[in-house]
Swiss-Prot record:
Citrate synthase is found in nearly all cells capable of oxidative metabolism. It holds the Pfam family Citrate_synt. The lineage of its organism: Bacteria, Bacillati, Actinomycetota, Actinomycetes, Mycobacteriales. This is Citrate synthase. Gene3D superfamilies: 2.20.28.60, Citrate Synthase, domain 1, Cytochrome P450-Terp, domain 2. The active site is at H316, D372. GO terms for cellular component: cytoplasm. One of its GO terms (biological process) is tricarboxylic acid cycle. Belongs to the citrate synthase family. Homohexamer. PROSITE patterns: CITRATE_SYNTHASE. The gene is gltA.
């Protein structure tokens, strides 16, 4: 192994020292957070590439959308603190903010809401697509496939270099993805599809299409509507995570917005990304059923590595402090469960949190509750099936995906993403004839 190091200079440059020479790199300055070293022609001039599995220290892009300070527990969309937005804005306002860069004026918000409201209907032929999927298909697979298929119905909105087409595709996706999710749910239940009602707002419409029936009026619960809106805001963007990076990767090939978003949905379906709230709920149910509801006993097992017990919903790849979304979700969980009826699993969750926040084992490992710890309890109380939780995550993350897709297309010097690798396979060898192997 050879020695190398990178040092900063006084002229806003960084210098890489490696066997055979030095390589000078520009430093790009962030408005907040970590500055970046621009590798530029490093490969051609040094013969070296960077090696960073999982992109732990690699910035793939410049972005103006979301800022995270994991050490301080800060999350901001376009400069606005997440707590401020969750308390004082609607999901559609936040969606507009992420996609357009500024909060909408009253007229702009009215137009945005109106466009979404009047594009919720699906082509009647589209409904037959849901009959193709098995009743036990995971709704994330159905949703991703449906968004892919949606692109075939809007072939005049597929050019990623046409701003007018991008605007139309943005509205179609914002309007129709929740409808696709609701239809996927109805199809696997064998329940009749519900047409959207333009007299309702987007969240009211979604809940009605999920749980209503055409034979009777659906009673809107404003507390449930507000809670769902708030949860979607909390999930609307989270910088360069796996699914967002997937959307940007696909979009870098100038694939259309529909198929790029479908790729993000597929990435989100992975249990390490979007399935954590389901895992938390399953953990709580396991503690109740198999550990007598004893939170202390369970947490002791977590600390004993030989027991192999995992604590779900604690810790985060980015946050080394309390996830700023978690406190908002916890408060929302209290509100919704108090309204809909108590849940002994909430009491159990609170007990687990209290133990973790007072125990040096968890504190030293920075294992604080994350956004997923309480969301599953809320979704279950609302009546959503457990395997539908990630679909709700996707609906919330949709405006963030759209914002990143569009930002990347408009970036100066945008190129198709093409990571490098360090090859560790066989060196050149001759093919051995089949009969001699």
């Amino acid at each position: 192994m050879f020695e190398r190091d990178i040092v900063a200079t006084d002229n806003n440059k960084a210098v890489l020292h490696y066997p055979g020479g030095e390589f000078e790199m520009d430093i790009i300055e962030a408005s907040e957070g970590n500055n970046g070293v621009v590798l530029g022609k490093m490969l051609s001039e040094t013969g070296l590439i960077t090696f960073d599995p999982g992109y732990v220290s690699t910035g793939s892009t410049e972005s103006k959308i979301t800022y995270i300070d994991g050490d301080a527990g800060i999350l901001r969309y376009r400069g606005y603190d997440i707590a401020d937005l969750a308390e004082n804005a609607t999901f559609n306002e936040v969606s507009y903010l992420l996609i357009n860069g500024e909060l909408p004026t009253p007229d702009e918000l009215h137009k945005f809401n109106d466009e979404i409201r009047h594009h919720t209907l699906l082509d009647e032929d589209f409904k037959s697509q849901f009959n193709v999927f098995p009743r036990d298909a995971h709704p994330m697979a159905t949703l991703a496939s449906s968004v892919n298929i949606l692109s075939t119905y809007y072939q005049d909105q597929l050019n990623p270099l046409d701003e007018a087409q991008l605007d139309k595709a943005t509205v179609r996706l914002m309007a129709k993805v929740p409808m696709l999710a609701a239809y996927a749910h109805r199809a696997r239940k064998g329940a009749p599809y519900m047409y959207p009602d333009n007299s309702l707002n987007a969240r009211e419409n979604f809940l009605r299409m999920m749980f209503g029936y055409p034979t009777e009026p659906y009673e809107i619960d404003p507390i449930m509507v507000k809670a769902l809106d708030k949860l979607l805001i909390l999930h609307a963007d989270h910088e360069q995570n796996c699914s967002t990076s997937t959307v940007r990767m696909i979009g870098s090939a100038q694939a259309n917005m529909f198929v790029s978003i479908a790729g993000g949905i597929n990435a989100l379906s992975g249990p390490l990304h979007g399935g954590a709230n389901q895992a938390v709920l399953e953990m709580l149910e396991d503690i109740k059923s198999n550990h007598g509801g004893d939170a202390t006993e369970f947490m002791n097992k977590v600390k004993n590595k030989e027991d192999g017990v995992r604590l779900m919903g604690f810790g985060h790849r980015v946050y080394k402090n309390y996830d700023p979304r978690a406190a908002i979700v916890k408060e929302t969980a209290h509100e919704i469960l108090e309204h809909l009826g108590g849940d002994d699993l909430l009491d159990l969750a609170i007990k687990l949190e209290e133990i973790a926040l007072a125990d040096d084992y968890f504190i030293s490992r920075k294992l604080y509750p994350n956004v997923d710890f309480y969301t599953g309890l809320i979704y279950r109380a609302m009546g959503f099936p457990t395997d539908f939780f990630t679909v709700l995550f996707a609906i919330g993350r949709l405006p963030g995906w759209i914002a990143h897709y569009r930002e990347q297309l408009g970036a100066a010097g945008n190129k198709i993403n093409r990571p490098r690798q360090v090859y560790t396979g066989n060196e050149s060898r001759k093919l051995v004839p089949r009969e001699e192997r």
